[in-house]
Amino acid sequence: MIIADNIKQFHSIRNSLIKQQKIGFVPTMGALHNGHISLIKKAKSENDVVIVSIFVNPTQFNNPNDYQTYPNQLQQDIQILASLDVDVLFNPSEKDIYPDGNLLRIEPKLEIANILEGKSRPGHFSGMLTVILKLLQITKPNNLYLGEKDYQQVMLIKQLVKDFFINTKIIVCPTQRQPSGLPLSSRNKNLTSTDIEIANKIYEILRQDNFSNLEELTNKINSTGAKLQYIQKLNNRIFLAFYIGKVRLIDNFLKETGPSC
């Protein structure tokens, strides 16, 4: 596996790739888990070359503490990527991605950008879309692999690719879950054993509910010791975000299936 720690190194590697080769790209913020691994395996099965990026993007964090406590396990991540036979790891610095600071940003005007996560985390989607645009301009992949867990993010990236005429196909992969139903997330690494017990109780409640009375469901979730930030039905999906201690988790799933594995 080739590791590029800056854009100049990456461009040298990218330019050496045979143009006829199909390139798959999996953007991550590190702290890799089986959800990321499923994306990478999908990319490996459909492309000649797979690029994975690790960059914890500061502009998409509206809470400084969340940014500072985001899990960092670079050496372990490198071992995971090497074991998966990833071709290129792109691991840029903040200075690489924002050489002159955060002077230009994508500001989404879509309705989906201003509800749920957009309402709860002002500026999050702007920062996310800005860095994704930069990463796509750098990597120039044929295929981009995203997880369904970040459903709003996926919808906005689809619009980004369309509006900016980016010749990249987006492949959306199913959310990977623990047996309890809890979606895999890098932030799960910050959960204590007690927190995990609370999460398991929440997902037991969610699996048994028919989502006809969200106020009652809110009370049930809060009774576990968690703090529900929002739960909402949108089309045929349920969206929710909640805190367990200081750890914020999000999820979405089809109303008919619930959070099934």
Curated annotation (Swiss-Prot):
Q: Which Pfam families match?
A: Pantoate_ligase (PF02569)
Q: Where's the active site on this chain?
A: 36
This entry's Enzyme Commission designation comes to 6.3.2.1
Q: Does the keyword Cytoplasm apply?
A: yes
Q: Which UniProt keywords apply?
A: ATP-binding, Cytoplasm, Ligase, Nucleotide-binding, Pantothenate biosynthesis
Which residues are recorded as binding (R)-pantoate?
A: 60, 153
Q: Which residues bind beta-alanine?
A: 60
GO BP terms: pantothenate biosynthetic process
Q: Which GO terms describe its molecular function?
A: ATP binding; pantoate-beta-alanine ligase activity
Q: Which GO terms describe its cellular component?
A: cytosol
Q: Which domain of life is it from?
A: Bacteria
Tell me the pathway: Cofactor biosynthesis; (R)-pantothenate biosynthesis; (R)-pantothenate from (R)-pantoate and beta-alanine: step 1/1
InterPro entries this protein is in?
A: Cyt_trans-like (IPR004821), Pantoate_ligase (IPR003721), Pantoate_ligase_C (IPR042176), Rossmann-like_a/b/a_fold (IPR014729)
What reaction gets catalysed by this protein? (R)-pantoate + beta-alanine + ATP = (R)-pantothenate + AMP + diphosphate + H(+)
Localization, per the record, is: Cytoplasm
Query: Partners and quaternary state?
Result: Homodimer.
Give the family, as the similarity comment puts it.
Answer: Belongs to the pantothenate synthetase family.
Its annotated function is as follows: Catalyzes the condensation of pantoate with beta-alanine in an ATP-dependent reaction via a pantoyl-adenylate intermediate.
Quote the protein name from its UniProt record.
Pantothenate synthetase
